[in-house]
């Protein structure tokens, strides 16, 4: 089986965290025996990325015996669905179905438009993969599959705390809280995390908030082993990779009730879901800091190991191809349907928002 993965997010030397989960999945699919080709969409003029991608995709399909196209994110899925030569699977990541949230926790109008386009697209592709039950509830049920992103257990594994701190140049006596996202992305809610850290530091001056942003996956894993707790106060998520990676490193955490966090942490000791209240977050983190133990989170997320998730994705591919072999016809959207949500101006704004959101 040959699969063409199409994406506008993919790690580079300058941005090693950008779309790292897409690369992880591509590598796990290859390891499982899938013949994977990549089409990474980019252009020096961002407004031209998606219109240009339509031609790039057609040329690639004309010159390759691809069985199926797997697109990451709704906008890329719209590009993929402008052709009907091969079936299309789209993985939605969160905001492309749920909409965008600003720094005040309010929904943005453009985000609502993009989410509407994503939901329309889900009815027109051969399969839609989403990250959580919440996302699944927003789209047509006949072809939706809940498959959260996997965790690379080889990279994200526990390292002795002192050893990790030495490698990162951190102080051995400090109590570090980790904020592992871009502080400039409003939905990640950095000011709240800073307020929680300040609240705790008034009673315990050894507490310090660390920000890990745009790090390589290997360094991020070290931060997770070096720190005492993850603070994750996001307004909205699909299935947050940071939470799953922290679980794989046995890092205690306190999170808002977003995406599938509650399901991920389950009954793991020293992992908490809290209301977005500074005193409540601070109280839970103080409990963690009182004994500074590690969790057994890694054992709770074995089902999210790369090989296990790859098999679930492959099962979707196989089901789609069997259906195609049976000559089942998908509903084709009108040209106007797709073009209305592929306008260059909106595509430009959407890509910028996706880039900001996916920086760790």
Residue ranges and their predicted role:
Residues 3, 68, 83-100, 128-129:
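Active-site proximal beta-strand in glycosyltransferases
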Residues 4, 170-188, 194-197:
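Conserved donor-binding/catalytic core segment of Leloir-type glycosyltransferases
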Residues 58-59, 108-127:
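Membrane-proximal helix-turn-helix segments that form the acceptor-binding/catalytic region
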Residues 122, 222-227:
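Short alpha-helical donor nucleotide-sugar binding micro-motif in glycosyltransferases
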Residues 151-167, 324:
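Acidic anion/phosphate-binding donor-loop and adjacent secondary structure
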Residues 235:
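Aromatic "clamp/platform" in nucleotide-sugar-dependent glycosyltransferases that forms part
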Residues 252-255:
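Short hydrophobic beta-strand element within catalytic cores of glycosyltransferases
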Residues 267-278, 286-291:
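Conserved acidic donor-binding segment of nucleotide-sugar-dependent glycosyltransferases
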